[in-house]
C-alpha cells in the first residue's frame, strides 16, 4: 500500500533533483502505481493542502507539504541508515519507507543522536535513496 507520505517523499526528492513541477507519470513509476491511482492520491493530497496539481503540468509541494516532506525525509533517512548500518537489513530503504509513518519522530531523533551521531542526512538533490527515485523492479 502506498501512503500519502510516500507520495510526498517522491515529489520532494524529484523536485530537489529536477525543476518543478514533478510529472505525475514520474511519481506513478516510482511508487509503482497506475497513473490514475497516482492522480487520485495526489488529488487527495491537494485537498489536504499539501500539494498543488496542475493537469498536464505536474505536481508541486505547498509550504505545508514541504514541511511535511522534509520531516518525513529526515525520518526516512535516519530509519534507513539505522536499518542498514545497525540492523544489517538488506532492504533497509523499503523497510524504512514502510515504517516512516509509524515511528514517532522522538524515536528517530534519539536514534540519530545516539546511534548515528556523525551521520549527515543525504542531500536529496545529490544523494537520494534509490527507493524514492527508481521505479520498482
Where are these regions (language model features)?
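C-terminal regulatory/oligomerization modules of transcriptional regulators
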Residues: 97-137
Amino acid at each position: 500500500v502506498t501512503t500519502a507520505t510516500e507520495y510526498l517523499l517522491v515529489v520532494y526528492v524529484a523536485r530537489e533533483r529536477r525543476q518543478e513541477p514533478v510529472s505525475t507519470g514520474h511519481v506513478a513509476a516510482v511508487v509503482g502505481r497506475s497513473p490514475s491511482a497516482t492522480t487520485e492520491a495526489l488529488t487527495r493530497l491537494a485537498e489536504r493542502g499539501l500539494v498543488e496539481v496542475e493537469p498536464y503540468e505536474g505536481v508541486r509541494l505547498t509550504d505545508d507539504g514541504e514541511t511535511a516532506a522534509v520531516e518525513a525525509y529526515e525520518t526516512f533517512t535516519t530509519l534507513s541508515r539505522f536499518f542498514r548500518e545497525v540492523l544489517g537489513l538488506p532492504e533497509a530503504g523499503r523497510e524504512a519507507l514502510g515504517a516512516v509513518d509509524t515511528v514517532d519522530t522522538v524515536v528517530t531523533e534519539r536514534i540519530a543522536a545516539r546511534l548515528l551521531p556523525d551521520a549527515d542526512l543525504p542531500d536529496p538533490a545529490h544523494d537520494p535513496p534509490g527507493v524514492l527515485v527508481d521505479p520498482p523492479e
